[in-house]
Amino acid sequence: MIVITTRTGAMTGFPLSRHDIRIALHSMLSCLGLSGAHVEVILTDDGESAQLNREFLGCYGPTNILSFPAAGPVAAPRQEPDSPPACRKDSSHAEDDTDLGVLALSTGAVHRESFLYGQPPHRHALRLLAHGLLHLAGYDHGPQMDDMTETLMQCATGKAAADTVVTGF
């Protein structure tokens, strides 16, 4: 189950609808073999992002996405570091009801960074959601996470294109 909570004003001008986010996250979770997992997404503004960043990480200022895992890693990489994982439909975690945790996405950061990186805002938002989801699933920063982020982007955009539900990819 995917729960999406929006703070006042956070959706203004945001490039993805709640439905788009749900479809993309369902595709990403399926690729991780976590189709039945629970994830909460909070779409927030820079002020709340900065508050959460300071309170939980001791850092000042807003950040793009924060991941708050509910428990220990559930889908930690199982391959050798030089072998990036692929979409796994046969994972032992498939179709379970694991609570992965909460993602807090700053919609302001999506707009700023998409301009800074020259990416369409909807693609940058998806990339940040993939990144945060991988943290919830037990991945740490590094080449394997980078590869897996791209894999999840392909899963999300391929699913969206096939179903013609999410537009703009």
Swiss-Prot record:
Essential cofactor(s): Zn(2+)
Disordered: annotated span: 72-95
GO biological process, any: rRNA processing
Assigned keywords, A-Z: Cytoplasm, Endonuclease, Hydrolase, Metal-binding, Nuclease, Ribosome biogenesis, rRNA processing, Zinc
GO (cellular component) term, any one: cytoplasm
Cofactor comment: Binds 1 zinc ion.
Xref: Pfam families: YbeY (PF02130)
Primary location recorded for the protein, binned into one broad class: cytoplasm
Lineage: superkingdom: Bacteria
Positions bound to Zn(2+): H131, H135, H141
Enzyme Commission number(s): 3.1.-.-
Single GO molecular function: zinc ion binding
Protein location: Cytoplasm
Gene3D superfamilies: Metalloproteases ('zincins'), catalytic domain
Summary of the function given for this chain in its UniProt record: Single strand-specific metallo-endoribonuclease involved in late-stage 70S ribosome quality control and in maturation of the 3' terminus of the 16S rRNA.
Family of the protein in this entry: Belongs to the endoribonuclease YbeY family.
Name of the protein described by the UniProt record: Endoribonuclease YbeY
Species, as recorded: Oleidesulfovibrio alaskensis (strain ATCC BAA-1058 / DSM 17464 / G20)
Lineage, top ranks: Bacteria, Pseudomonadati, Thermodesulfobacteriota, Desulfovibrionia, Desulfovibrionales
